[in-house]
């Protein structure tokens, strides 16, 4: 229906989607920065350094570091430095993981997320870094579409020439 576009609802949905994407990659970056950490340095779930975990941690972090850097360059640089592919296996430790964790936690408020949303992960002890996560509560992420919403009521599945724009 022409003229039925709700700009504020679209912005709210875009913000919610962005927050969900950020949550996914921050959780994965934290998980693999921890799994990269060898048992000998205080980590309990990892058997030792693994190039696979290193690559996964770096890749997941890189997925959101551009966005994080736009908001807090220092935090992004800390994560980049700690998970960089140029780091030697013997440079990974619980301390490196805790630096990643602290840097990411410091930007939760400006990312619109909080500690409860990120969680602790299935293998990361709550106080593994000597302190628990604390951040102000973020607004809840909307649960989904409103009752009665029909995505096909206003848009066809396929567009004809000139029908691509909203």
What do the predicted segments below correspond to?
Residues 1-166:
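Mature extracytoplasmic or organellar-lumen-exposed domains after removal of signal/transit peptides
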